[in-house]
């Protein structure tokens, strides 16, 4: 069959095939739908009526019975080649023929289609000219976003989105990205304190730091829940006239004295005597003058000395003291009766076991307070842009504390989570509960079993009407408070240890304290450091905690032996390896976290010292354990006796008064003694 007449306008005319169905005749709707152009003399009509007719004609043509008996070759029809070079064939609707368009016509058609495209749809990924984004374009984009953020009337969700886009546009080096590589850690580290494997490697893919809800806006963008923005959310910022406003030379001890004096002068006291629902009596005036509680600003806080004086109320007493110092009673109108009801019931829910008891909970709470209250030398704790919801610190402050950068709601959540974080701990590890198919492991699907249990059970306790001390929070604050508490508690699972450290080091140069997720990340670091702080304490305290964790491990080993299970490493009472346990724990778990926080200036440094006392104590304690390992491996009995002026029992060096809870000075044998005396 000879070809038909030449194509006109780039579209082949219909070709008749003997015995076939009538040729397809392009209609007005056909041109509009396929080529985005209007036949001569026609105006565009996008009315719903024509759209419906077009769909009807298309369906009729497709299902026409006349085409049912036509061969594939007949339905395909003939192809008319255009005289232009490089033409592109376009399929004809219904598959009855094929036409061609020139390159120029196709380009015009594409641009016309882009002009008609809905602006709410995702951006098209095709590029006809292959243009690339330049640095100047990025700078211009960041400038435009900065100008938009200057508008104080922007909705909260829009401002959050713009800040997130600004961070994505930043391209800065990550100085601590390879920090974990410096420790020579293997890809998988066995957790000596839990018997589980911890993965050391690249962090998970970057997750947006914005929490989106369902798509409800007219533009198709997901909405962002607005952050509570109340005066009290940033009320921990102190004015110059505030009695608790510190200068660069003040210490938290000075602040405690000022707060106490100010409280007495103003008469702003909670009820003098509070009696809980179970009859426990608290005298708040006595709590305000407790000499042990006056030492909360010291890292070597005498926790065991206080526990001997108040064995059943140590956690509630310490929590009251810290809440008072942070002025949380006044800011959130906390009921003293409900406060003591909850925290006393909470401490009663801790088991009488060697390590994971109410003393450990109080120690973690103290660690969170110490790390957040002392000034640190981190550069990213200063607000970076003028649209911050937080008031900037005093311009003459050389250093700022983490406490001054967190909202009071975040502070209360951090302190509450620290007190709750090991509630109802049975003295067994997650791995043990999974292995014996404990009901808690079944309930939480073997994932963060104990951490989920602590969070769920302690929150149930808090929700009791007589314990609900957060009753004056509004719904948004309540939701945020619960979210923060759960995140902080779940972060104490050591299986997340390296993931949190990697996330922090990767975001180090981008961290902005105005961003909720960055403040949450800092809070996770604080509670994690407080939870494993034992090796960073003076040796006297560290040795007491070591004896306690070993005894709890031995009890699990005894249980495993009774059940006929393999005994977890370091938990066999007949094969004590205390020095190796602590060496592994410090090298693989504590040191990476402490070093990362110290490198970025998140650990407090006392006046007169070049580095944090936590790092000094950790290195000192680690050296002592490594020396003991060397002696156990090859040292003589006489060498063990004379080492460090201590005595040796069964090959284990014991310094005098170091491992007894009656030691009057918890700083005994600390390398800081000589430094501070100088």
UniProtKB/Swiss-Prot annotation:
It is an enzyme of class 3 (hydrolase). Gene3D superfamilies: 3'5'-cyclic nucleotide phosphodiesterase, catalytic domain. Residues 7-19 have a biased composition (Low complexity). Residues 281-632 form the PDEase domain. The active site is at 356 (proton donor). Residues 60-85, 231-246 have a biased composition (Polar residues). One of its GO terms (molecular function) is 3',5'-cyclic-GMP phosphodiesterase activity. SMART domains: HDc. One of its GO terms (biological process) is positive regulation of gene expression. Keywords: cGMP, Hydrolase, Metal-binding. Binds 2 divalent metal cations per subunit. Site 1 may preferentially bind zinc ions, while site 2 has a preference for magnesium and/or manganese ions. A divalent metal cation 1 binds at residues 360, 421-422, 531. PROSITE patterns: PDEASE_I_1, PDEASE_I_2. It catalyses: a nucleoside 3',5'-cyclic phosphate + H2O = a nucleoside 5'-phosphate + H(+). Coiled coil: none annotated. Its EC number is 3.1.4.17. Belongs to the cyclic nucleotide phosphodiesterase family. This is Probable 3',5'-cyclic phosphodiesterase pde-3. It comes from Caenorhabditis elegans.
């Amino acid at each position: 069959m000879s070809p038909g007449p030449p194509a006109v306008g780039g579209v082949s005319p219909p070709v008749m095939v003997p015995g076939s169905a009538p040729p397809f005749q392009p209609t007005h709707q056909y041109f509009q739908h396929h080529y985005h152009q209007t036949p001569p003399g026609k105006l565009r009509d996008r009315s719903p009526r024509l759209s419906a007719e077009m769909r009807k004609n298309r369906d009729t043509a497709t299902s026409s019975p006349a085409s049912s008996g036509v061969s594939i070759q007949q339905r395909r029809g003939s192809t008319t080649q255009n005289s232009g070079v490089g033409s592109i064939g376009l399929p004809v609707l219904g598959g009855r023929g094929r036409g061609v368009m020139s390159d120029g016509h196709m380009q015009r058609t594409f641009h016309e289609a882009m002009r008609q495209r809905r602006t709410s749809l995702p951006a098209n990924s095709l590029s006809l000219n292959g243009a690339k984004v330049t640095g100047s374009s990025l700078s211009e984009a960041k400038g435009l976003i900065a100008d938009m953020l200057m508008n104080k009337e922007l909705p909260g969700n829009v401002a959050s989105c713009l800040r997130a886009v600004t961070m994505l546009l930043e391209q800065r080096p990550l100085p601590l990205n390879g920090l974990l590589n410096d420790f020579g850690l293997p890809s998988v580290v066995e957790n000596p304190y839990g018997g589980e494997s911890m993965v050391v490697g690249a962090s998970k893919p970057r997750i947006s730091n914005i929490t989106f809800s369902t798509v409800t806006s007219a533009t198709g963008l997901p909405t962002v829940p607005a952050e509570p923005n109340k005066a009290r959310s940033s009320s921990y910022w102190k004015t110059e006239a505030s009695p608790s406003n510190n200068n660069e030379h003040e210490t938290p001890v000075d602040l405690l004295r000022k707060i106490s004096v100010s409280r007495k002068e103003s008469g702003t006291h909670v009820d003098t005597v509070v009696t809980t629902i179970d009859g426990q009596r608290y005298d708040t005036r006595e709590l305000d003058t407790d000499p042990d509680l006056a030492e909360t600003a010291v890292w070597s806080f005498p926790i065991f000395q206080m526990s001997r004086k108040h064995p059943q109320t140590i956690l509630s007493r310490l929590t009251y003291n810290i809440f008072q110092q942070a002025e949380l009673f006044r800011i959130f109108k906390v009921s003293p009766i409900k406060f003591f009801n909850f925290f006393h019931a909470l401490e009663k829910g801790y088991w009488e076991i060697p390590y994971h008891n109410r003393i450990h909970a109080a120690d973690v709470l103290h660690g969170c307070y110490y790390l957040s209250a002392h000034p640190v030398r981190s550069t990213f704790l200063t607000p970076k842009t003028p649209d911050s919801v937080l008031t900037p610190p005093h311009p003459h402050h050389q250093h700022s504390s983490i406490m001054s950068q967190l909202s009071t709601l975040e502070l209360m959540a951090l302190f509450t989570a620290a007190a709750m974080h090991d509630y109802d701990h049975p003295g067994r590890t997650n791995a043990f509960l999974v292995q014996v198919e404990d009901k808690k492991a079944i309930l939480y699907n073997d994932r963060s079993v104990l951490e989920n249990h602590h969070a769920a059970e302690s929150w149930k306790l808090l929700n009791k009407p007589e314990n609900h001390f957060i009753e004056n929070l509004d719904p948004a604050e309540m939701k945020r408070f619960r979210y923060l508490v759960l995140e902080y508690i779940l972060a104490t699972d050591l299986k997340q240890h390296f993931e949190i450290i990697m996330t922090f080091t990767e975001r180090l140069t981008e961290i902005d304290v105005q961003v909720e997720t960055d403040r949450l990340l800092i809070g996770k670091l604080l509670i994690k450091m407080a939870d494993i702080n034992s090796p960073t304490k003076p040796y006297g305290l560290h040795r007491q905690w070591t004896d306690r964790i070993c005894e709890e491990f031995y009890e699990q080993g005894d249980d495993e032996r009774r059940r006929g299970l393999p005994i977890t490493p370091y938990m066999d009472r007949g094969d004590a390896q205390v020095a190796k346990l602590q060496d592994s724990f410090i090298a693989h778990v504590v040191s990476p976290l402490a070093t990362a926080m110290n490198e970025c200036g998140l650990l407090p440094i006392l006046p007169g010292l070049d580095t944090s006392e936590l790092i000094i104590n950790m290195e000192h304690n680690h050296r002592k354990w490594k020396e003991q390992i060397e002696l156990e491996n090859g040292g003589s009995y006489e060498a063990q006796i004379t080492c460090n002026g201590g005595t040796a029992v069964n090959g284990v060096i014991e310094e005098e008064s170091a491992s007894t809870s009656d030691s009057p000075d918890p700083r005994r044998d600390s390398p800081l003694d000589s430094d501070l005396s100088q």
